[in-house]
Amino acid sequence: MKVPFLDLALQHRALREEALAALAATYDANRFCLGSDVEDFERSFASTLGYPNTLGMSSGTSPIHVASMIGGFGPRDEVIVPAFTFIASAWGASYVGARPVFADIEEGTYTLDPAALEAAITPRTKGLVVVHLFGLPARMDEIMAIARRHGLFVIEDCAQAVGARYKGTPVGLFGDAATFSFYPTKNLGGCGEGGAFVSRRPDIHERAKLIRVHGMVKRYHHGIVGGNFRMDGFQGAVLNVKLPHLAAWTARRRAIAGRYLAGIRLDGATLPSTPGHGESVYHQFTITHPRRDALRAHLEKRGVGTDLIYPVPLHLQECFAPLGQGKGSLPVSERVADSCVSLPIFPELTDAQVDSVIEAVNAFA
């Protein structure tokens, strides 16, 4: 049985008429930049997921940039970022002239290791980006205790974790600012680029709102340095159609993950851990195996799509070579990057397809 790694067309076909009607209404009303569609989404996102506020932004990278501006990071500052994540997690620090310092992750959870965080802190450390990778919350109690002790500005990168909770509390409500992505492949994806900024602190929310529109306090009067980080109306319209389905999609992802966890029995494979502190939303289901490339080739022959997320940790990316964190410096991130493979997990998968993936994985020898 052929099982694609991801098939967005299934979701979009099911929502086609409703989405096109919403887009037509936005088009006819000329609500192209921010506007009522975005405002409606901001209110719904906040109320549905338990946030005090939401600011729609132009991409998932935009709120990381905005949060780094608000954090006051500058050329003499260091910002700690986990080495195993998408590169946008480190761009905010880079954009404002700060130095990303990469820290190692835990095996199994793929999230920031609190001990590695503590070891990476220097007198120049001013901030921290915590990534709730693949939908699993990081260990926020330990991480926030370290951050408070050192006076760090904490950005929670929730791009892959919309709807996830840490000990019952939504991710994004622990740090100073939280960022979300609505890239089409995300658990809640738009039809193009989109993101959101959330903060439990009203002062940070208001500053981000100002930065989003060029720092403009009133028309053509600019109080602070800002940028163009606005969400467009079409994305707001599409996300308004999709948001009511998020809970059901998340439940289906969890059911698929549960089926994988119960059914995969492959010697040498490490499956995602399920620590008691976090309720994962399973943006990815990533396993590791010492013969990863051979396993992936085997699955391809069996018709199972896979992906490598992420094959090169950030400290070994060419653009960060001048920072000097070379090969061997972050062994867990390097080992995971060399051995990880992600299996299909999206809400439209059938049980028969999931069982076919399990059978194919278990048949590897």
What is the predicted role of each segment?
Residues 108-190, 196-198, 342:
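Active-site phosphate-binding strand-loop segment of PLP-dependent enzymes
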Residues 1-31, 36:
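N-terminal "arm"/small-domain region of PLP-dependent enzymes with the aminotransferase-like
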Residues 75, 81, 102, 154-156, ...:
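Hydrophobic residues in well-ordered beta-strands that form the structural core
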Residues 85-90:
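Conserved coil-to-alpha-helix start sites within the AMP-binding
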Residues 96, 149-150, 302:
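Helix C-cap/helix->beta junction micro-motif
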Residues 9, 21, 36-44, 48-54, ...:
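PLP-dependent aminotransferase class I/II
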Residues 29-78, 92-96, 102-104, 169:
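Phosphate-binding glycine-rich loop
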Residues 99-109, 307:
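Short beta-strand->loop structural element characteristic of the AMP-binding/adenylate-forming
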